[in-house]
């Protein structure tokens, strides 16, 4: 069974498990309340008092690496006379008066209802490493209640998990927790003396102060809590100063708790030797050094961050398509610092809507009034809405006002795309092409592509977010390109669901002065490439990425492509030339940090041509990769389609569109805040299916028009596109 089917089965089993306990246990009056505008389903519980536990809540995720997420609201029920929590993710905040910022073994006892509990993971806030410890527990059949006793190694309990929690239990198939006990060993070593560290962060080339990501670790790997001189960061409704850097950040230390500072930083720490790490995105080299902190002295360090590449000098400016934060005021230096510290020039901050609610609100001012800029780095408002598992998640850039559909028209995506298209500079597309999970033909990508299949033939889809979370998924994008639709690629981190801003990014070539208007205008022309490390250069007969080259049949096409990759991030593997979706040439990097490819093609017909580069890291869920937008070669006004593939692709996409009017809804088990939207989406799908018929008919007519035009280009496609010189 595939991983996606296993996961869906597990989630359905969880629902069944919770239904079973609900049928046999008594619901008690233990009111749960949500925490503000919280997209994680955080619900605090009025549970029985547990020693040294200040708060208990259910949530969608714990933010302790390795602890599973969930989508079922927690309940408190009586089981055999005991008050128990039924749920998937349960967070526990240890009373700070009992334990806070310690470093010692802690004994944890968890009592659960055996018959209703599936395998679960205990996660905790830990010193060193990723900042999280995990232990897996597999219940064995036995008594009505079982107590699992575990040792939480190097427990820190400094409130780094969701809503300041210290410990979380995650069980995708459900768990029934009936009591919990935390007992300290009191082995934390109290420092005998302290000193101070003062950091100055500069760009080595300009000498100016810059924000950066930082790590400071003692000889045990412990990261002292960041001081109030660091940036206050936002993760959902959490305000915190430290985060855990995942493996996709290429962070060079085995210790991955990091913080951010804007030019200067100062803190008080125990005396000793520390590892100091600093970074500023993929165009900069890592700084690594050791510093000594002595008693009652200040250790001053100036970090001159060295560039590996200077993309703005060549007119290329990076952006992140997909950042979620709540912004109350347009001017937000803390948030700006978070984005600028990763050297992202354009951070698109997206309000996020669903059929019931809107999260991550942006200021009332939109359009140009929503832009905040400092030192050539911008943050600007946009939106991710509408969002459904049936049609996909959509992103809209550079908009003059938000366009959130009402519940009774939420599946009428075309209304948003048409409204944004009518706004000066508005750009619309689809997110998350890298998602995996349940959906059409066992792959949610099929469902996510349904919205694109409906709107692309109407000329409403400007881009697809093909790179996210270490995955570049190009199948749907290539299909649209092979129909002649000039859809651009984008890359977005989806912070705080996935990566820090800028871990994946897309570069835009700007001719002339850089500002947001010129950046969005150049992106709209397709002058872009997506990457999480490799940097690309690509021309055909002097035309660059995203440009159109009109030639006569038989014209020689001189392809010149190059890629480079900072070896501190990964080892460059190869560069590929892609013609109409097929790899036409490959050049190995042969152990070097840069590679060039030269190829001669013959323009026998129109085509789209792109390049992509790979690093050595090629895990399916974590690949080092870059991909350019195409250069479009036009011969005799023929569309840049893959002529022989057009009928098959049209039949596939046309079928998906036509089934919209008859298929039942397939609401994903996770995503889209399913705990608050599932029933509404199911009801509204039935009501709104008939309303989609005009759009379905328009898309069908557009596909037929494409086939009619295709028939006029009757000459067979050549077997090859050229030869290597």
Where are these regions (language model features)?
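Solvent-exposed strand-to-loop "edge" motifs in beta-rich extracellular domains
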Residues: 111-117, 564
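Exposed low-complexity, polar/acidic, P/S/T/G-rich flexible segments that act as propeptides
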Residues: 172-190, 630-633
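Beta-strand-rich domain onsets/edges
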Residues: 183-196, 202-207
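C-terminal functional module detector
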Residues: 202-267, 273, 277-310, 483-725
């Amino acid at each position: 069974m595939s991983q996606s089917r296993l996961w869906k089965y597990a989630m359905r089993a969880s629902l069944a498990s919770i239904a079973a306990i609900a049928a046999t246990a008594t619901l008690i009056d233990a009111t749960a309340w949500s925490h503000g505008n919280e997209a994680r389903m955080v619900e605090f519980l009025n549970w029985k008092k547990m020693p040294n536990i200040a708060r208990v809540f259910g949530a969608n995720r714990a933010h302790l690496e390795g602890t599973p997420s969930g989508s079922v609201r927690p309940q408190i029920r009586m089981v055999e006379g005991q008050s128990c929590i039924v749920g998937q993710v349960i967070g526990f905040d240890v009373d700070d008066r009992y334990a806070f910022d310690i470093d010692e073994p802690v004994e944890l006892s968890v009592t659960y209802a055996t018959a209703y509990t599936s395998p679960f993971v205990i996660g905790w806030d830990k010193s060193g490493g990723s900042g999280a410890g995990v232990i897996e527990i597999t219940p064995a059949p036995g008594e009505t209640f079982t107590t699992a006793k575990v040792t939480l190694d190097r427990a820190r309990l400094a409130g780094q998990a969701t809503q300041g929690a210290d410990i979380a239990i995650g069980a995708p198939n459900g768990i029934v927790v009936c009591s919990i006990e935390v007992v300290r060993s009191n082995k934390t070593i109290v420092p005998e003396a302290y000193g101070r560290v003062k950091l100055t962060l500069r760009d080595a080339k300009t000498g100016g102060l810059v924000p950066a990501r930082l790590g400071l670790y003692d000889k045990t790997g412990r990261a002292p809590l960041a001081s109030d001189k660091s940036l206050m960061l936002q993760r959902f409704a959490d305000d915190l100063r430290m985060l855990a850097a995942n493996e996709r950040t290429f962070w060079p230390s085995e210790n991955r708790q990091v913080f951010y500072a804007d030019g200067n930083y100062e803190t008080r720490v125990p005396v000793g030797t520390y590892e100091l790490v600093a970074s500023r995105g993929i165009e900069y080299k890592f700084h690594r050094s050791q510093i000594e902190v002595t008693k009652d002295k200040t250790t001053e360090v100036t970090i001159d961050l060295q560039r590996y590449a200077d993309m703005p000098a060549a007119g290329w400016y990076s952006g992140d398509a997909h950042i979620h934060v709540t912004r109350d005021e347009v001017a937000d230096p803390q948030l700006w610092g978070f984005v600028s510290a990763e050297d992202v020039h354009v951070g698109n901050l997206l309000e996020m809507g669903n059929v019931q609610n809107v999260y991550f609100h942006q200021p009332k001012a939109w359009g140009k009034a929503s832009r905040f800029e400092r030192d050539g780095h911008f943050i600007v408002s946009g939106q991710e809405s509408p969002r459904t598992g049936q049609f996909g998640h959509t992103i809209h850039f550079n908009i003059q006002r938000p366009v959130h559909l009402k519940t009774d028209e939420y599946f009428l995506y075309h209304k948003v795309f048409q409204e944004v298209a009518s706004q000066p500079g508005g750009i619309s597309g689809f997110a998350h092409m890298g998602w995996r999970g349940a959906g059409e033909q066992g792959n949610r990508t099929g469902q996510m592509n349904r919205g694109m299949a409906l709107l692309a033939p109407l000329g409403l889809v400007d881009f697809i977010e093909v790179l996210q979370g270490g995955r570049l998924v190009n199948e749907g994008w290539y299909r649209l390109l092979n129909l002649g639709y000039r859809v651009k690629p984008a890359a977005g981190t989806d912070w705080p669901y996935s990566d820090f801003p800028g871990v994946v990014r897309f570069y835009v070539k700007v001719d002339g002065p850089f500002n947001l208007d010129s950046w969005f205008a150049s992106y709209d022309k397709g002058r872009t490439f997506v990457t999480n490390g490799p940097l690309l250069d690509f021309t055909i007969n002097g035309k660059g990425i995203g440009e159109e080259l009109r030639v006569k049949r038989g014209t020689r096409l001189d392809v010149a492509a190059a890629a480079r990759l900072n070896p501190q991030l990964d080892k460059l593997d190869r560069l590929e030339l892609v013609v109409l979706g097929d790899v036409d040439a490959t050049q190995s990097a042969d152990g070097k940090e840069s590679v060039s490819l030269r190829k001669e093609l013959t323009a026998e017909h129109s085509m789209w041509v792109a390049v992509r580069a790979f690093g050595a890291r090629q895990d399916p869920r974590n690949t080092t990769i870059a991909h350019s937008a195409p250069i479009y070669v036009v011969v005799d006004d023929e569309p840049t389609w893959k002529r022989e593939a057009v009928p098959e692709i049209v039949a596939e996409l046309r079928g998906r569109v036509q089934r919209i009017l008859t298929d039942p809804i397939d609401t994903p088990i996770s995503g889209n805040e399913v705990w608050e939207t599932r029933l509404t989406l199911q009801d509204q799908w039935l009501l709104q299916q008939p309303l989609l018929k005009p759009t379905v008919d328009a898309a069908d007519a557009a596909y037929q028009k494409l086939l009619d035009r295709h028939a006029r280009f009757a000459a067979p496609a050549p077997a090859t596109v050229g030869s290597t010189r």
